[in-house]
Amino acid sequence: MRIIDQNGCDYPYESIAISHGDGVIYARPISNMDKRYLLARYSTQEKAEKAMQKLYDDYDLSKRFEALGYKAVQNLISWNGRKETEKFLYENIFSFRFPQDDEF
């Protein structure tokens, strides 16, 4: 799964550790935990927690979808049209974009 921050930068979920506090969400590369990257900034901690819950839910969905296997994805693409389905899968299943503060 890909994680996209509020500015559009892209991070591989499996290569980062994500933490939050005081309305801010950071990523730390597993290979160098001394570095950190700002993923999202919210006006309240409650909004940050909602964003994190959405991330957890979307990650769970992506793992469930991944478990269906290649054949299910192939069937979905042939049923719904390749370009539209690939775009849907990438934008909604295999990536997560942190919402802007005003989207909550």
Language model feature labels by segment:
Residues 1-104:
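Eukaryotic intrinsically disordered, low-complexity regulatory linkers and tails enriched in Ser/Thr/Pro
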